[in-house]
Every structure is written in C-alpha cells, then in structure tokens.
Amino acid sequence: MKKIRIKLKSFDSGILHRSTKEIVMAAKRNGALVSGPIPLPTRVSRYTVNKSPHVDKKSREQFQLAVHKCLLELSSFNAHLLSTFTNFQLPAGVDISVEVRDE
C-alpha cells in the first residue's frame, strides 16, 4: 500500500495552520484517508550580536528565528489526488515536500 507523506515548514504558525487545513480538506474531498496534522518540533535559532562595533560589550541585541513544521500522511488515494497536489497553490512562506512511500 502506498502512502503520501507531506511535510510543511513555515516561519509563521498561522499560515502553516491554514495551509494544512486546505490540504486536509482537499484530500478528504478526493476520498483519501488522512492521519494528521502531526506537529513536529519547532526549531528555534537564537542569534546574539553586539549593538556597537567597538566598545560597550555588555550592550547586545538578541534575535530569534523559529521554523514551525507539520506532517501529514495520506493513504488510499488515487491519481487525481496526486495531480491536485502538483497544482496546489500555497501561500508564500510555506515550504512543502511530498514523498510517496511503499509500505
């Protein structure tokens, strides 16, 4: 049995949530069994930089970048669903990777 594993990444959790809802609704309309969305751990990168280039070592600024991730698994799908995902329009800022697996 083949399964489709869809991983979504975004810097904005709201956009990621709306995109997963759209994908789940499209999959259910085409008769696929959906397991998920499964939230994956958020990767947070923190950066500390000096405010001044010369003196005042104690004066620093901190930035952070959070990457939110989510996983969907679809089973019992048809070829029409695959063509739907290739033409699917996601908002800017959402990265999608689609993987077809044999299980």
UniProtKB/Swiss-Prot annotation:
Coiled coil: none annotated. InterPro entries: Ribosomal_uS10 (IPR001848), Ribosomal_uS10_CS (IPR018268), Ribosomal_uS10_dom (IPR027486), Ribosomal_uS10_dom_sf (IPR036838). Signal peptide: none annotated. GO terms for molecular function: structural constituent of ribosome; tRNA binding. Keywords: Ribonucleoprotein, Ribosomal protein. PROSITE patterns: RIBOSOMAL_S10. GO terms for biological process: translation. Pfam families: Ribosomal_S10. Disulfide bonds: none annotated. GO terms for cellular component: ribonucleoprotein complex; ribosome. The keyword Ribosomal protein applies. Belongs to the universal ribosomal protein uS10 family. Involved in the binding of tRNA to the ribosomes. PANTHER family: 30S RIBOSOMAL PROTEIN S10 FAMILY MEMBER. Part of the 30S ribosomal subunit. This is Small ribosomal subunit protein uS10.
